[in-house]
Amino acid sequence: MSEELLSFEPATGEQLWRGKVSDVDAEVEIARRAWPEWAAKPVTFRTETLRRFADRVKAESEAFADLIARETGKPLWEARTEVESVANKVDISVKAYAERTPNRRIEGAMGLRSAVRHKPHGALAVLGPYNFPAHLPNGHIVPALIAGNSVVFKPSEKTPAVGAKLVELLHSAGVPQEVLRLVVGGPDTGKALAAHPGIDGLLFTGSARTGLALNRQFAGQPGKMLALEMGGNNPIVAWDTADIRTAAILIVQSAFLSAGQRCSNARRLIVKDSLADALIAEVRELANRLIVDHPHADPAPYMGPVIDNEAADGLTESFLVLMSNGGQVIRHMTRPVAGRPFLTPGIIDVTTMAERPDVELFGPLLQVIRVETFEAAIAEANNTAFGLSAALIGGTPQLYDQFWANARAGVINWNRPTNGASSAAPFGGVGLSGNHRPSAFYAADYCAYPVASAESDALRASIGVGLRDPEGSQLVTKKYL
């Protein structure tokens, strides 16, 4: 009997989906054979095919959102925004392909010209995460297909149903089944796909641990594209502001949206000491009011569960470790539903901790650090090996200029949350957050490579110096055409 993969709803524990584990060798071989024909299609054909995909997503938006909500546990309202992002990605990617990888031709004298064009890599593997199981892999798949690549897509083993639905919608729009392949399986299947000699590159969104392993694996293969987006230990700095209420809202959005399961969520609140008491009280009061419930509950929750009990257990343990090492609890993280991975927002002051762990705590847990000076705030913001997202709340234009110039991150915001980045801009980080292959609008860059050409419609050449004359008696300088 073939091995199977099962998927369960985080909110209820009920089985949602089951499917057979894929044969990686077979799927890669199919994609490799298919990509030359797909690449040979005009780009207008490929883009129109994907525009039909966007229409299919819109036509099935409510059912798709319901599936995302059930398999991830995120509130239905949030799942709807994810579906909207999936549909919107097509037009954004078409524009990005035209702007980031244009064909250019420069005419020269005597019929000579130079040109720059772009080619697809071939068969690309995509490894998707569970937190945005449609939007984030779609952000790799759509630009890869527009550029003329074939794709072998492995969704997270925690959200295979959404991945399968995404592929179904792409196929129904006219993307050939051979060009886009779905690989179902667990971590071993992902490792087999990443190591497969038949792929020409891998596009990854996930944890730093997995991303670092992939980086080591691909280090000896410079001919293969590797694009990594690996999360962050993101700081949000709160400075001089009289609008404590709005500042608190921005902080809560940054820390607890998606139950803290966004790579761009704030993990650390760095706050001016003289502002801290009033601001923290407002943040705690607002966090107390957040509804944590089933994704389809009425009234609608702000947060659903985290992805599974293993994740919830790890976050609870991390909160206890921070407490035992000197952290002062501002708001306890609790498990309100026995046996299910619901977590209430946790807030803890770690200012006096001698050594704070530099890890991505992927859930609704916010650490508070008090500082005296703005220079200390920037130093604390940069006190991490990650570098994805950072935000300044309050301050002045001059302070923001200082923050922007010195904060080490790929996304730097002012008076906006750390999360909710626009797909019309690049999205990526430095350090342990990525390998300088930003996604979103810049995904086009890693889906094709540039080819420079010198061209002439007719044979035209000369050797101007260093030739003997035909009799071999002397050197001549005249040109032989």
From Swiss-Prot:
Function comment: Catalyzes the NAD-dependent reduction of succinylglutamate semialdehyde into succinylglutamate.
CDD domains associated with the record: ALDH_SGSD_AstD
Record keyword GTP-binding present: no
Disulfide bonds, paired cysteine numbers: none
Binding site for NAD(+): 206-211
Protein name: N-succinylglutamate 5-semialdehyde dehydrogenase
Enzyme class: oxidoreductase
Annotated catalytic residues: 229, 263
Family: Belongs to the aldehyde dehydrogenase family. AstD subfamily.
Transmembrane segments: none
Species annotation: Sphingopyxis alaskensis (strain DSM 13593 / LMG 18877 / RB2256) (Sphingomonas alaskensis)
GO molecular function: succinylglutamate-semialdehyde dehydrogenase activity
Keyword annotations from UniProtKB, A to Z: Arginine metabolism, NAD, Oxidoreductase
